[in-house]
Amino acid sequence: MAIYHLTAKTGSRSGGQSARAKADYIQREGKYARDMDEVLHAESGHMPEFVERPADYWDAADLYERANGRLFKEVEFALPVELTLDQQKALASEFAQHLTGAERLPYTLAIHAGGGENPHCHLMISERINDGIERPAAQWFKRYNGKTPEKGGAQKTEALKPKAWLEQTREAWADHANRALERAGHDARIDHRTLEAQGIERLPGVHLGPNVVEMEGRGIRTDRADVALNIDTANAQIIDLQEYREAIDHERNRQSEEIQRHQRVSGADRTAGPEHGDTGRRSPAGHEPDPAGQRGAGGGVAESPAPDRGGMGGAGQRVAGGSRRGEQRRAERPERVAGVALEAMANRDAGFHDAYGGAADRIVALARPDATDNRGRLDLAALGGPMKNDRTLQAIGRQLKAMGCERFDIGVRDATTGQMMNREWSAAEVLQNTPWLKRMNAQGNDVYIRPAEQERHGLVLVDDLSEFDLDDMKAEGREPALVVETSPKNYQAWVKVADAAGGELRGQIARTLASEYDADPASADSRHYGRLAGFTNRKDKHTTRAGYQPWVLLRESKGKTATAGPALVQQAGQQIEQAQRQQEKARRLASLELPERQLSRHRRTALDEYRSEMAGLVKRFGDDLSKCDFIAAQKLASRGRSAEEIGKAMAEASPALAERKPGHEADYIERTVSKVMGLPSVQLARAELARAPAPRQRGMDRGGPDFSM
């Protein structure tokens, strides 16, 4: 969304600055040319006659400007991300003309991409007024001669000096940007005023800047980004608290109206009751209604104790000499209505605190005076404590504890390329680097976890489960050590089968469980990543129309070994031994060296078969296209198709492959085919197919064994 950011700096020779170096930097020229792709647009204006290219002017400023003179004024401002590049160019040029056009001050501007999420503009302005008089470079920067301007240097503007100039510039930028957003049809707006002046109850944000964005993009954690993320989190919770407060006020008003309505209908607001003939008008005794709306009926009025926060506590007032039935009605009906309402509100209170436990404390802590230094800047050290109750940290901590490993592989999948960035961390390092992981997730990347490669463990991942599958697993002694909800009603389970089990055993158990519970077979191996709780699922198919992604939630974290764990390990060992015997048999059969052409004698192409298989599988499994790919490839491989044939068929016929696996389609195909070709059942089927005579092979081709799940 559009954000407001504008800063102004002065570059002077006395301060050690160089105008040429600054111009080279913002235009990515000279020694900065290696990063020239960062510059989306550059332009200059109001340059004097001696200038052939903008660098000449800023070179001359370094050479000829007086020792105590100011070389340039730099204005840096964030461009609205909602605008296209052409719209951003037009906006930056328009604003530059606003600041320089009246006196024709020479300027150079450059728009930087800022990693795609932080587009911004650097504007360098010279204080020398271009009055149209032609002067050489050496004369241009001399002292101005008011009597004979052509003999002196260019006059300096006074407009950039007053302190009011910065406030005027900040306001002008907000006006220009908002007009551009309005012209482009966007509802977003920016405001140059302080949050207090706007009447907004939230913490001021921190501008990251291009260097921080670049470092974070390369996987380098920065304190400034951590602070910005903490503030964003706190502000989101402030908004939640404000909405909750408004909801409570609304509920109280509604319940108050409900109570009054009950009183009017039942007559409980009448002190004498209906048998005394009270019609709601002035009583015969002439008593006026009391402030609480109760009426006297003769005799004195005794105040009952004030109600506590938990309920009404009574009928409000007791009237001496009133009807016993009326008094009983007053004592019961309004109290019952109010009691139910307030009990419901109390339950909502409890639910809110469960969801936002510690949020208010953190917000107050973030806003406290000692969170800033004596210059009003945020103190990084002071912000560590307030986030100790962060719910993402809590979820991560519980997941790490339930997994029970010493070291973990953390994977961050790049949203654009699909490549995985890996980090091997201890549990403490994972928690320490949570702010950086949040930043990566906020930029559209998914966050994953698995035990480190050298870690001795007995965890097996079962992916793509339903609630019914989880219930069946628990009933059959395969209860998970932890359960993660990756998207609404879709779960991953880590099953602990032993304190330590080899990778081959874990892989076999994963395939067994995936087959028994109709889970994702493509994820059934010993090294597959699972989701890390506390972050959002950034896959496009889970994004709502409003642009929201579901949170990855930790549903269970018992960390216990499954009851059937030892039996699963034993069964897997037997299956591995059987597979090894089958592979040995397949090798002996392969030694017969039947012609390869006998394996591939098919009347239909691999592409035809793949499309035919996918048509039935998609009807069966719906949107789970990865499972369809895996089973289709398994069937083709069992019929003798080569890995190359299967890969080509998958590349051409797999539905929406580019949208599902953007940037890593080839890697996905290679991994899927490799897993399929390594299955013992596939190897045995291929060996038997190779041994069979040609007619037998064609018969199997038409019918073929069914390896579907």
Curated annotation (Swiss-Prot):
Entry keyword Nucleotidyltransferase: no
Annotated a divalent metal cation binding sites: 112, 120, 122
Outcome when changing residue 38 to A: No decrease in conjugal transfer frequency
GO molecular function, one term: DNA binding
Site (Involved in DNA binding): 70
Main location, first listed in the record: cytoplasm
Gene3D superfamilies in UniProt: 1.10.1240.50, 3.30.930.30, RepB DNA-primase, N-terminal domain, Single helix bin
Annotated GO CC locations: cytoplasm; DNA-directed RNA polymerase complex
Keywords: Calcium, Coiled coil, Conjugation, Cytoplasm, DNA-binding, DNA-directed RNA polymerase, Isomerase, Magnesium, Manganese, Metal-binding, Mobility protein, Multifunctional enzyme, Plasmid, Topoisomerase, Transcription, Transferase
Active-site residue list: 25
Basic and acidic residues: compositionally biased ranges: 251-261, 272-290, 324-336, 698-709
Cofactor: Mg(2+); Mn(2+); Ca(2+); Ba(2+)
UniProt EC number: 5.6.2.1, 2.7.7.101
Catalytic activity of the protein: ATP-independent breakage of single-stranded DNA, followed by passage and rejoining; ssDNA + n NTP = ssDNA/pppN(pN)n-1 hybrid + (n-1) diphosphate
Start and end residues of each stretch annotated as DNA relaxase: 2-186
Residue ranges of coiled coil: 567-594
Region DNA primase, residue ranges: 315-709
Region described as Disordered: 1-21, 251-337, 689-709
Cofactor binding notes: Divalent metal cation. Can use Mg(2+), or to a lesser extent, Mn(2+), Ca(2+) or Ba(2+).
Self-association and partners: Interacts with MobB and MobC to form the relaxosome.
Protein family membership: Belongs to the MobA/MobL family.
Protein name: Mobilization protein A
Organism: Escherichia coli
